[in-house]
Amino acid sequence: MAKFLTMCAGGNVRSVSLAWALKDVGQEAIAVGHLYTRPETFRLLVAWADYVIVMQESMVALMPADVPESKLRVLDVGEDRFGYATHPELLTIVRPMVASWMRRDFKI
């Protein structure tokens, strides 16, 4: 089982959608928002996680310098235009990606 930290702006829609999809296939996942997570909390979660997945390419620049590049991944779903974590368009992006990671035993 891999441990995932998923991050979007608020930690309520895009990152939650990915975290739920990962949990659905037996992985551990915690969703956070960069706007509402204190730096010390974020560092603690990064230390716990095998992978830190940001939901938009521009969020890579928000990562503290000490986040290992080996943990950082991008699943760019764009700006939050979805409004809720189970939005059909968002799920058509997230679920196939999780399925592809599962085929690789979550070595992403």
Predicted regions and their residues:
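Short polar/charged helix/loop
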Residues: 1-108
